[in-house]
């Protein structure tokens, strides 16, 4: 008999953190779960940790594959998952014991397609409020929708959610970007959903890595990472323009004050050739942003954004040099 909930966990070189995530899944108040572990070619002790867990808890199973990236690992796990509901967890994070019970119970009561909950940042053993989500999850709202509550444009991560599996399959949802893969899929799902439940309860602890390899989001200024971030911005924006264009101004403002800001900052330590792809992608994105949204940005900052988008990185650095320390 299929489990009520399947949780897909991609694994790649997370030996210091994987036991904590697996312990948190094993301790879930919702016990009727299937945990699909996908070892994406780990070269550390992660595979051995996963195999040991599978041997001791029949709810866990392991798929092993050559390294193909997070999107491919999630998609592989989803194909094996059989639960009526679907969730994703990253192998270096922690899921509070009550999380999946609350999210699934809410969906069963409301009939919504997605349930989403609040997030905290985990540093060592300290749990911090995540400023970006403070307002978004301040109150519980059932059977809402992104087109009626545009604050959900900021709810772009996949791991603080449970999806109704029939909804996921009906729309053929899958991950396709090699990095920053959450946003296009999550925003697409938000728009396609009949309704969404938003819980003020904390359902996920997102770790800041201090051991092992840094996470993708911790490598802000590496050229390949900068380009990957901008590709996410463009792909997500294109989905919004196609399916819910009335949300694009909110999305564009959020990007300009967040991901685009970090992209432009990368001009301080990288050359024009290294950032060529990122410049092209930012240029493409700016072409979709309404002038009224651009006018809301401080003029000096907008000038730096346009220099980056034009590939004029030397001039951008000169602008940074003029700024006070």
PLM regions with names:
Residues 208-325:
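C-terminal subregions of glycosyltransferases and related glycan-biosynthesis enzymes
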Residues 1-238, 242:
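Nucleotide-sugar donor-binding/catalytic module of glycosyltransferases
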């Amino acid at each position: 008999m299929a489990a009520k909930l399947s949780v897909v966990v991609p694994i790649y070189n997370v030996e210091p953190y994987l036991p904590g995530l697996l312990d948190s899944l094993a301790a879930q108040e919702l016990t009727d779960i299937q945990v699909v572990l996908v070892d994406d070619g780990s070269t550390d002790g992660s595979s051995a940790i996963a195999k040991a867990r599978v041997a001791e808890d029949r709810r866990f199973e392991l798929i092993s594959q050559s390294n193909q990236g997070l999107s491919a690992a999630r998609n592989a796990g989803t194909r094996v998952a059989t639960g009526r509901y679907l969730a994703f967890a990253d192998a270096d994070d922690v899921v509070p014991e009550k999380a999946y019970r609350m999210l699934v119970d809410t969906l069963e009561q409301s009939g919504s397609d997605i349930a989403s909950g609040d997030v905290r940042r985990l540093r060592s053993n300290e749990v911090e409020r995540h400023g970006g989500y403070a307002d978004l999850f301040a109150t519980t709202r059932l059977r809402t929708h992104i087109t009626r509550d545009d604050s959900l444009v900021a709810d772009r991560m996949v791991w603080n959610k449970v999806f109704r599996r029939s909804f996921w399959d009906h729309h053929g949802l899958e991950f396709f970007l090699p990095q920053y893969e959450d946003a296009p899929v999550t925003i697409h799902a938000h728009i396609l959903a009949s309704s969404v439940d938003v819980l003020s309860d904390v359902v996920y602890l997102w770790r800041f890595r201090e051991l092992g390899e840094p996470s993708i989001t911790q490598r802000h200024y590496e050229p390949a990472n900068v380009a990957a971030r901008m590709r996410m911005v463009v792909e997500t924006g294109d989905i919004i323009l196609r399916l819910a264009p009335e949300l694009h101004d909110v999305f564009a403002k959020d990007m300009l004050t967040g991901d685009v800001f970090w992209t432009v900052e990368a001009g301080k330590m990288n050359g024009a050739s290294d950032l060529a792809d990122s410049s092209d992608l930012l240029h493409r994105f700016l072409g979709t942003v309404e002038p009224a949204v651009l006018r809301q940005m401080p003029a000096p900052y907008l000038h730096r954004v346009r220099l980056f988008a034009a590939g004029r990185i030397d001039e951008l650095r000169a602008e940074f040099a003029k700024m006070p320390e």
